[in-house]
């Protein structure tokens, strides 16, 4: 499984919101400035995160975006699925109906299922709050979300 820029940049954007959560609602231009993600692309990402009830918008002069839930309640899996959809490596084990006629007889399906289980376990047990703590340990003065980095 390879994540698209939606998943990678969306995770950076919500991590920026989490790191800066004590500053009230955060303008999308501020997120863009810190992460190097264009405002237009951020608007698309934030829209998906809002639909998944991970981010909320605040209107007005001091408006912007903030987390909709506590960061201890938001998993990386929640974020990635909101942006990418199902994380299954192959169609036959996704939550969607498979078009593969031999899915029930497929020996390699066991491999794909184990990979899927491992991915889901990893992203569902890693919370946004853990990423915030890790970012503070790595660089307590600046969140490293440079667009040229992973």
Q: Whereabouts are the PLM-identified features?
A:
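C-terminal regulatory/oligomerization modules of transcriptional regulators
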Residues: 94-150
